[in-house]
Amino acid sequence: MSTTVNVDSLAEYEKSQIKRALELGTVMTVFSFRKSTPERRTVQVIMETRQVAWSKTADKIEGFLDIMEIKEIRPGKNSKDFERAKAVRQKEDCCFTILYGTQFVLSTLSLAADSKEDAVNWLSGLKILHQEAMNASTPTIIESWLRKQIYSVDQTRRNSISLRELKTILPLINFKVSSAKFLKDKFVEIGAHKDELSFEQFHLFYKKLMFEQQKSILDEFKKDSSVFILGNTDRPDASAVYLHDFQRFLIHEQQEHWAQDLNKVRERMTKFIDDTMRETAEPFLFVDEFLTYLFSRENSIWDEKYDAVDMQDMNNPLSHYWISSSHNTYLTGDQLRSESSPEAYIRCLRMGCRCIELDCWDGPDGKPVIYHGWTRTTKIKFDDVVQAIKDHAFVTSSFPVILSIEEHCSVEQQRHMAKAFKEVFGDLLLTKPTEASADQLPSPSQLREKIIIKHKKLGPRGDVDVNMEDKKDEHKQQGELYMWDSIDQKWTRHYCAIADAKLSFSDDIEQTMEEEVPQDIPPTELHFGEKWFHKKVEKRTSAEKLLQEYCMETGGKDGTFLVRESETFPNDYTLSFWRSGRVQHCRIRSTMEGGTLKYYLTDNLTFSSIYALIQHYRETHLRCAEFELRLTDPVPNPNPHESKPWYYDSLSRGEAEDMLMRIPRDGAFLIRKREGSDSYAITFRARGKVKHCRINRDGRHFVLGTSAYFESLVELVSYYEKHSLYRKMRLRYPVTPELLERYNMERDINSLYDVSRMYVDPSEINPSMPQRTVKALYDYKAKRSDELSFCRGALIHNVSKEPGGWWKGDYGTRIQQYFPSNYVEDISTADFEELEKQIIEDNPLGSLCRGILDLNTYNVVKAPQGKNQKSFVFILEPKQQGDPPVEFATDRVEELFEWFQSIREITWKIDTKENNMKYWEKNQSIAIELSDLVVYCKPTSKTKDNLENPDFREIRSFVETKADSIIRQKPVDLLKYNQKGLTRVYPKGQRVDSSNYDPFRLWLCGSQMVALNFQTADKYMQMNHALFSLNGRTGYVLQPESMRTEKYDPMPPESQRKILMTLTVKVLGARHLPKLGRSIACPFVEVEICGAEYDNNKFKTTVVNDNGLSPIWAPTQEKVTFEIYDPNLAFLRFVVYEEDMFSDPNFLAHATYPIKAVKSGFRSVPLKNGYSEDIELASLLVFCEMRPVLESEEELYSSCRQLRRRQEELNNQLFLYDTHQNLRNANRDALVKEFSVNENQLQLYQEKCNKRLREKRVSNSKFYS
């Protein structure tokens, strides 16, 4: 964090004064790029929750941010928020911006104080508070988190919480309350007064809840193998862990060297003691406090020694390091339409990235711009980017930054680039070699705080080394076009691209962004969509019954209300509300004022709509002679769905399926009442298939799945119109008779939207593979006679997915026997995903593609008069009779000409290769001034496939597909080249969604700059973050010395591989998992070894239903042992998924670590979101044990591997005999016999391996005790 104030020099009393001023609050001006006029707000720090809040009035907070999420505090007017209000004069030294968040794109709070003193106080105070928040102990963070929960239901910051409020909070924090009695019993147990908990009681409730849910984990410390034996764990204070027991646990089980110092152990224990009376020379932890310690970040699996920079490792040549590298750094989203921003450069540099990319194009006023050429990504000023790099390059890391320049500028604008580099960077810019006579690259230490330019360089004769093959596909037609939808009779906007004589198009852009477009609803109709509006209620008593039932369930808050149409007076309404334990009614009258209908409760205050009247009295008290009251909770209308076009009261499942099958668009849906029950079903279309999901009633709520609660079906539909219901599908097309009629009229056009033309069903590719086949992820030994035993990699056929986590299947000679579902993965799903990947491999729109037109089958013509209210239209007319024409439109005549010409060249078979060559020839001039700035990173293309005799001053860039080809053919040659020269690898152009490729094999072959899309939250970016967490997050990680030995082979044959380590993992439990959508999480954990292909392996736990707050897998979860060949180049990865109502996994959180940085013992695994940002208090508890494999044991492990491979072959051969009757069965008996012998031998070998691990552990525990 960067400020102009050195807070470390402040005395403690000065820090306290500053914090007190921030707590009292300051009136400041808030700027936002979304608003043209700045606003005055009171900004203050809420110390109890560690949040910055801003408000217009004292009783209503408008917004807040968590201090722990602050990434930067930037002095001055250095954010785009200030740009819209340039007319407002604010002094530079009074302004500052807080950048915060847990996504790649950060949020901003831009403020202007009234004085420089106030601004300095806030800059200093926020830095102090951020340091304190980042260093806070886990118990302190828990207390702050509990305060947030109380304040979330009442902003007055009272010190208590009611039973009704607690019932509301628990589902929001991922815990399902089993019954109302459960909470009431807990209140009695804690000693609550009148259904109200004080904060201290709420804290006690939390501690009891977490302990009771997870106390079985402590059974691990009652075993003989434990280094100390724990006593009774029935209650949180039933027994204790004493000082010397805790020290023994830390030294022998956790292998913490610092624990030799008893004072440090005492200090660690004191942080977790919830009673100052026990903070003595001989402290002890109650068992619930010990359990909290196990889950805490103080007990993290991460070895904190890697947080420091190892300066001894920073003196090798640059080519010996992996260097954190970004692709198209300026982008904040996809490669086609997203925003470019200097903030993306700042974010990457502050994340430790050391190689960033600048895509430079000619801009106005002779100054370049940066954007992704020939796309709709926004343009940013080159000069702004250079200044941002200068300001932030060395904040996180002092080691060199490489600027990879993608050059598209004219010579004149290149000269401006060179000038800007020299003027802005000054001495930071590297302009000459560090050593004139060197024969290798300099080290990171030698290049400290230097900026290196990677750019084409003029040769001795002024020539440029450029390979035309690299550019041949770059100049292609792409952009936005309108397509005429003859079914909906409207133009829809799509992103389109031409490649290989095919036109690919994306989803309708308006539909992908529709939630951002506000609907234009007349003010007089605004109340129609509100849940408090009940239209006509048959009788006054019916309204009273609704209110009474709602208040009985929720606790009866005064002001609970509903609005209904008046039974007696036309245009009037009735307000019914709850006060002092009974229902009262008020008439909302109407009157004409100046020709406009107005509504009122009191004569002196009228409103233009019912909505405005209700909103007013929800914020302001309604005052009458007898009472004063503000409207609070709305009573939802129980049946608003009955008037909706998507609802069917009497429709069978078969009729619903028939209707959906006639509408070939994903997102089509209807809801129907199920026959003979008080439940409903939603029927929808997704991925070309019709699916159903039951909607149950729970009191007044509608429940989708097991824990997604909605007040009404209307609310359910509204929610899933904005959020994904299944995979990425949102509800889009209500199935109505009118929609069915339109589709029946236009059947031919359906083929355009039929994704099956683009994706092939897996069964068509491999029909011999049964649809219900799974692959074993790990060995399993049967514990009962009706269970299967199998080895890792086994294929289990004819699987029946039974409920309860146990499936049935066929393996070898065992037919329809049980096995645990978490030991396998469904290979039909994996095959389908791989198939999708293969089919979109060469598509210019990648995964965004939703349709393809083969231009060779069409003729292109213009529509001179335009069509359907569009002026610039061209039509693809099919050459084959009977196919429908496809109509396109553009906004400008120039765009129409470009698209028409591009398509006509294809349809007329014009070879454009010569034109492309001329285009690039014309654009290859290099400014001498820019060429002179290139010292070490000179790109070479003409000879880059030749990996012999590397020149350390050159760099070779490969697209991922080319790099993959080199690795398959000559991995050792690439490794040896990288020992002296540099390589940079970047994503293929088809990754328009900014997805990433697997970087591991490239790292394995020594590629230094493996450029990824930092803005994308995916597995490979998470692995990248894990790798560069090493060495103090400098962005430079020294490759293992073994990679530079003569005999090292990155892809060794199987005969040369040796297991060097076994890693045993057991997942015990989790806390505070994040919540997706409306449902309470049903989590499971996938544990994976990521590395070379021969190291890759994974394991899944079972699913825990409806508990994301405190799920456990102990004591039933077994330990899993992974065999690792190369621990220096492998990662341990934990991914937490939730299983949704369709049994699909959805990502919740992850934690990925280089195995060398993993600690042994019972360890907390702090969890991160997709962007590798910490999730408050979220963690796993695991047992982890690493053991080197001795030479004498290698033969045993080798025998296991050979037997596993043979068992896979035998199982597949047996399956062929059993499924193909025409095969001769002469050899079947011999196969069965060999299979049985091998299976027994494999189990024997595996038991020997496990026995050795157990013996070592038991002998160790006896020694320690």
UniProtKB/Swiss-Prot annotation:
UniProt superkingdom: Eukaryota
Domain PH intervals: 20-131
Keywords, comma-separated and alphabetical: Calcium, Disease variant, Hydrolase, Lipid degradation, Lipid metabolism, Membrane, Phosphoprotein, Repeat, SH2 domain, SH3 domain, Transducer
Listed cofactors: Ca(2+)
Active site annotation, chain numbering: 327, 372
InterPro entries named among the record's database cross-references: C2_dom, C2_domain_sf, EF-hand-dom_pair, PH-like_dom_sf, PH_domain, PI-PLC_fam, PLC-gamma, PLC-gamma_C-SH2
Name of the featured protein: 1-phosphatidylinositol 4,5-bisphosphate phosphodiesterase gamma-2
Organism expressing this protein natively: Homo sapiens
Gene: PLCG2
